[in-house]
Amino acid sequence: MYENELKRILNGDEKTLNKVTKSMNDREKEAYLSMIKYPFIVIRSTGSLGIADLVAIRSDLSMLIEVKARSSNKIMFSNESGRVQRAAEEMWKQCNRSGVMPIFAFRMKGYHGDAWRLFTLKVSSLSGKAKEVNKIIPKLSITKKMNFYMVWEDGMKLSDFIRIINSVGGKSPSERWGMITDNII
């Protein structure tokens, strides 16, 4: 369900964008609606490839995206017999091999406003925009036992991510992130 929502957002589907932005502030809404002009081709893997739920591709950026949705603010990857942890490790390995950015998208159920938060892992083989963007997205947290976890509040808003990747004017993603955080703080 939420995989399809994120797929349609990144694909610039106007009907979905109008629906999900109803409870957002103007800044968040503006960012989401920019996906109409700068869409991705997004492929949803049925039954999951074991690596990711979505593959998003456009001329300047490619991403493997794992989608999680919860009504609580924390996701422990070690739950579910370690299946999620193993899948995240495999996704990181494949992204390092291929130079593709991994994204872990956490949707808070029942939240009004921008309900999506993004996380990533450091990937040394990235180049161009992906390398710059990967530096500024919060990384997955790691427990003492070396298992990943996400705390929703620690992630980057999807609207901020979209604003960074869709901005024009020649500024680097890190410069745009500075502009965004200046407006937040």
Each predicted region: which residue ranges?
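Substrate-gripping "pore-loop 1 plus following alpha2 helix"
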Residues: N79-E90
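Phosphate- and other anionic-substrate recognition elements at nucleic-acid/protein interfaces
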Residues: N25, K74-M76, I142
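Active-site beta-strand-loop-beta-strand hairpin of nuclease catalytic cores
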Residues: G47-K68
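Acidic-basic catalytic patches of nuclease active cores, encompassing PD-(D/E)XK
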Residues: M1-T46
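Nucleic-acid nuclease catalytic cores
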Residues: W92-L126
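Short amphipathic alpha-helical segments and helix-helix/interface helices
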Residues: K7, A88-C95
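Short beta-strand-loop-alpha-helix junction that forms the active-site gateway
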Residues: V67-S81
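Intrinsically disordered, low-complexity terminal regions enriched in charged/polar residues
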Residues: D114-I185
